[in-house]
Amino acid sequence: MLGVRRALLLPPLQLALLVAAGTGARVSAPRSLAWGPGLHADAVLPVRYFFLQSVDSDGRNFTSSPPGQTQFKVVVKSLSPKELVRIYVPKPLDRNDGTFLVRYRMHETVHEGLKIEILYGGEHVAQSPYILKGPVYHEYCDCPEDDPQAWQKTLSCPANEPQIEQDFISFPSINLQQMLKEVPKRFGDERGAIVHYTILNNHIYRRSLGKYTDFKMFSDEILLSLARKVTLPDLEFYINLGDWPLEHRKVNDTPGPIPIISWCGSLDSRDIILPTYDVTHSTLEAMRGVTNDLLSVQGNTGPSWINKTEKAFFRGRDSREERLQLVLLSKENPQLLDAGITGYFFFQEKEKELGKAKLMGFFDFFKYKYQVNVDGTVAAYRYPYLMLGDSLVLKQESPYYEHFYVELRPWKHYVPIKRNLSDLLEKVKWAKENDEEAKRIAKEGQLTARDLLQPPRLYCYYYRVLQKYAERQVSKPMIRDGMERVPQPDDSTSVRQCHRKRPEREEL
């Protein structure tokens, strides 16, 4: 049964009607529901999306895929026949719980607006057709909203993020001059992976500190994407592109900690955490450069629970010794665990003993009922995607965390396993013997992950971190020597079609 507290996932008027439709029921197009950011012109995202809830003629929600061959059909087109635009609309993703996820990616801006038709068996669904009055901007249109509060309201940003509040407790004020002196000395050596950013007048500037800064392409792309959507505060900060969090000083130390921004946190560090480059890149490149993203995984969760293989499953690199232990456990207990290493780098001498497993498509992981999540060098960045599936996640206890872990609870959203994996087999046996409880935890984890990992929420999180940081600066951010401007991708239509900008006049 779907939870009733997730307003972004279920339309409010339907919250009282969560009664499963009968097995012989048919979908009623008029009574079915459509909602989500993709039905609103102002909610600019790389991939726009919305949800469908299949409902029968008695007003009861389907809680599994509707029977029969009829499918939802969605057409997204320009309101004006004079505007010829490319819009990619794949077929709706069946989330196997009676809901569907509809995605579309715009490749040009539409000035007049969009018309979205949602059909089932030739009938319009809910309030279809939906009219999105123009302009409707595509991802690369540089047209930021000047009112951050209005932008946050459009995306339904949460009032607060617990991890952000926790991270900034250590930094009631931020001394840029102190950081300018300390960061290059402490973290900017030959092995460093630090990028120094300044955002000024919504333009982004940076300089690299250290040798290993190629991953700045990932921090660049999400900052540029954010700046195209909303006017950012002026600020100056350092992003750590490496795996491990850097600042280990305690609040009471002298000198105290400095606010380094990282993608992964740990219990013994003070870094400020942002969503990982993996989830932001997959969000930016969804339906274009990547196939596994926070949306696509929701429609590729494998067989239904009852038809999944009753084993725990793992595939991955050898980036932590416990992963090798998984393979040994698997060899000794093949009836409970299927684990394999797909690539050796850290423990190459073990390949002959443990063998090398063939690569598998990520979506095939969900053929198995239980997923083992073990750290890599730090937190395993597959974890968000595993949580969005409908398998039960067995998560290794870890000092490392991503931005959303603070919202998850053991035995409610996942089953914990000890750091040394000594209780893994015991937990697999428990899950097999308590199938309904295991299924309930898996479902609760999936629904919570759907809420926490929506693409708009990532943008909200990024903006809130930058905003909190900017509020605490005690001196004015500046463009420093050696910084270069990071240009927006070229889009000749941006200025012409952005209603918030006037074309720049050419100098005579």
From Swiss-Prot:
GO molecular function, one term: EGF-domain serine xylosyltransferase activity
Pfam families named in the record: Filamin (PF00630), Glyco_transf_90 (PF05686)
UniProt pathway: Protein modification; protein glycosylation
EC code: 2.4.1.-, 2.4.2.-
GO CC terms of this entry: endomembrane system; endoplasmic reticulum lumen
Broadest EC class assigned to this enzyme: transferase
Subcellular location: Endoplasmic reticulum lumen
Stretches assigned to coiled coil: none
Gene3D superfamilies: Immunoglobulins (2.60.40.10)
GO biological process: protein O-linked glycosylation via serine
Disordered as annotated region, ranges: 480-508
Annotated catalysed reactions: L-seryl-[EGF-like domain protein] + UDP-alpha-D-glucose = 3-O-(beta-D-glucosyl)-L-seryl-[EGF-like domain protein] + UDP + H(+); L-seryl-[EGF-like domain protein] + UDP-alpha-D-xylose = 3-O-(beta-D-xylosyl)-L-seryl-[EGF-like domain protein] + UDP + H(+)
Positions of short motif Prevents secretion from ER: 505-508
Signal peptide residue numbers: 1-24
Residues listed as glycosylation sites in the UniProt record: 307
Filamin repeat extents: 25-134
Family note: Belongs to the KDELC family.
Name of the featured protein: Protein O-glucosyltransferase 3
Native organism: Rattus norvegicus
